[in-house]
A protein has these predicted regions:
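Terminal accessory/targeting
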Residues: 1-56, 71-81, 195-239
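Catalytic domains of cell-wall/extracellular-matrix polysaccharide-remodeling enzymes
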Residues: 68, 114-239
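Active-site beta->alpha N-cap acidic-glycine motif
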Residues: 31-117, 123, 127-134, 142-143, ...
């Protein structure tokens, strides 16, 4: 009888521990901070109380369209942020220097365009630091903003970026210009329901270069000021 009770007690304890373990996994899955969502530490927009908007160009190709993009920015007297892919910069070092010399902001887009949400903490650090080191070697400028390739990030990604002194940047508007080669569509996506603090994702494509003067004209006519991302997010506090 005593043995039976003892067995029942042990069984109940084991079952209780299993329930607690399953509950812990459900409520606090691996890689998710219990102190708050990882996304709370990432910038999806800038200062929403301002009239600032920011074009952010993610660059792993399209070097032939960048001169036209730079000319349009110069024409309107504004500057944008270019998130540079490291392996691209290795082949187009003069283009990187040209972007910088014309007053635009350089930022970090990783080295090999990996899915950084799948990388370890150290793997993320390697991707980010390798790109940052290259841009600094080419221009003497240290990058402080990081946009994850394909918008894919995890807690490891954000921790790695912050450990290296970066702020992680996403976007509030996506023109999807890498896929949809239509200047009118790109223009509409960049300007529809525009709001202060918008971070507008673009890439150097032929159609983006064609649409850009009209986009910048729309900003100006509607009282918005195109500024680099660092200016737009200045003063915006994150967790």
């Amino acid at each position: 009888m005593r043995g039976s009770r003892r067995l029942t007690l042990v069984t109940n304890i084991v079952l209780g521990l299993i329930v607690l373990a399953v509950g812990a996994v459900c409520f606090f899955p691996p890689g998710v901070s219990t102190a708050g969502k990882v996304s709370d530490r990432v910038y999806y927009s800038g200062n929403t109380d301002s009239r600032y908007v920011s074009l952010m160009f993610n660059v792993y190709g399209g070097a032939e369209y960048i001169p036209s993009i730079l000319d349009s920015l110069d024409q309107y007297g504004v500057r944008a942020t270019f998130f540079i892919g490291g392996c691209w910069a290795d082949d187009y070092d003069e283009t990187v220097r040209e972007i910088d010399s014309r007053g635009n902001e350089l930022a970090n887009h990783g080295y090999f365009h990996k899915d950084q949400d799948k990388l370890s903490l150290n793997g993320n650090k390697e991707e980010i630091s390798r790109c940052g080191d290259l841009v600094e070697m080419l221009t003497g400028k240290k990058t402080v903003l990081f946009a994850p390739p394909s918008g894919a990030y995890s807690e490891n990604t954000v921790n790695a970026a912050e450990d290296l002194g970066y702020k992680v940047i996403m976007w509030s508007k996506d023109t999807v210009d890498w896929r949809d080669h239509d200047a009118t569509l790109i223009y509409n996506r960049a300007t529809k329901d525009l709001a202060g603090g918008d971070l507008i994702l673009m890439h150097p494509t032929k159609e983006t270069a064609e649409a850009l003067p009209s986009v910048l004209r729309n900003f100006a006519e509607n009282g918005f000021l195109q500024v680099p991302v660092s200016v737009n997010i200045s003063g915006v506090e994150k967790a």
